[in-house]
């Protein structure tokens, strides 16, 4: 699940939700909603910002989502 992956990667980096939001240039509420599963379809811009903040490629961030859709 996308929400779980974001939370796990964020925790692994030692980032708070607030810090991740700042680094990704998105609102704190956006991160909260994504991690809680409330926001199931974040924009590509949001996902790109999060991937940059987590220092992983966008492909790596969304690959599990792509695999489940097949």
Which ranges hold each PLM region?
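Short, charged recognition helix plus adjacent turn
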Residues: 33, 40, 52, 60-70
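Short basic helix-loop element that most often maps to the first helix and adjoining turn
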Residues: 4-23, 49
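Short coil turns linking two alpha-helices in DNA-binding domains
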Residues: 16, 27-30, 43, 57
